Every structure is written in structure tokens, then in C-alpha cells.
């Protein structure tokens, strides 16, 4: 049986979030939470929150045992970009693109 949790429109670059997602893919939930706790990245906080939401979904809606859960799949998709302008010399401006991410975590029992 599988359980999923999704966090959308997170203000972190998908490229940077995928680096942290690769750390927990395939791990037991308890190990993944420990890894994320000591990961000094902004995306680590977002993935930690999404993982805890998936665990709560498993406990409350499916009555699954938390000790047997592992991260079956985790992926980070690209969200919409915020477009901002930075003033430059001689009246010019350059575009700044601020990325956002959608994080999906799927847990399963071993």
C-alpha cells in the first residue's frame, strides 16, 4: 500500500531541492528524517515537512505502521517562475528569474 504527500509552489530552486531529495530516496522513514534534520539546506526543511505529512497520512488515513515505511519515490518538479527586474547602468534592467518547486513523496511498506 502506498501513501503520498505533495507540497506545491515552494520558493526553492528545483535543481537545489533535487540534491537533497537524492539523499533520502529509498531510505527508511526514520533514517530519512534524521538525514534531513542535519542537512543545512533550505530545501531540507521543505522536504522534511512534506515527509512528516506523508507519515501522518499513513498513520491517520491508512492505519499503517510507521516503522515499516520507506521512501519509495520522491521527485521535485518545476513550478512557476517569478520574474523580477534588477536596475542596471544607463537606464537598463536585467531580468531575474526566481524558481519554485513542487515536491511529491510516495511512501510504501516493506
From Swiss-Prot:
> Which Gene Ontology terms cover its molecular function?
rRNA binding; structural constituent of ribosome
A GO-annotated cellular component = cytosolic large ribosomal subunit
Which UniProt keywords are present, listed alphabetically?
Answer: Ribonucleoprotein, Ribosomal protein, RNA-binding, rRNA-binding
Q: In the UniProt record, does the keyword Ribosomal protein occur?
A: yes
Q: Which residues form the signal peptide?
A: none
* The keyword rRNA-binding appears for this protein: yes
A Pfam family cross-referenced in the UniProt record is: Ribosomal_L22
Protein's GO biological process: translation
The protein's matches in InterPro entries, at most eight in alphabetical order, are given as: Ribosomal_uL22, Ribosomal_uL22_bac/chlpt-type, Ribosomal_uL22_bac/org-type, Ribosomal_uL22_CS, Ribosomal_uL22_sf
Subunit-structure text:
Part of the 50S ribosomal subunit.
Q: Which family does it belong to?
A: Belongs to the universal ribosomal protein uL22 family.
Described purpose of this protein according to its UniProt entry: This protein binds specifically to 23S rRNA; its binding is stimulated by other ribosomal proteins, e.g. L4, L17, and L20. It is important during the early stages of 50S assembly. It makes multiple contacts with different domains of the 23S rRNA in the assembled 50S subunit and ribosome.
What protein does this entry describe?
Large ribosomal subunit protein uL22
Native organism: Syntrophobacter fumaroxidans (strain DSM 10017 / MPOB)
Amino acid at each position: 500500500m502506498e501513501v503520498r504527500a505533495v507540497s506545491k509552489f515552494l520558493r526553492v530552486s528545483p535543481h537545489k531541492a533535487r540534491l537533497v531529495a537524492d539523499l533520502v530516496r529509498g531510505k527508511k522513514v526514520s533514517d530519512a528524517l534524521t538525514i534531513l534534520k542535519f542537512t543545512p539546506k533550505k530545501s531540507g526543511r521543505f522536504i522534511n515537512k512534506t515527509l512528516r505529512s506523508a507519515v501522518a497520512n499513513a498513520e491517520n488515513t491508512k492505519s499503517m505502521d510507521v516503522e515499516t515505511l520507506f521512501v519509495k519515490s520522491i521527485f521535485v518538479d518545476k513550478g512557476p517562475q517569478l520574474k523580477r527586474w534588477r536596475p542596471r547602468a544607463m537606464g537598463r534592467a536585467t531580468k531575474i528569474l526566481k524558481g519554485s518547486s513542487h515536491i511529491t513523496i510516495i511512501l510504501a511498506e516493506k
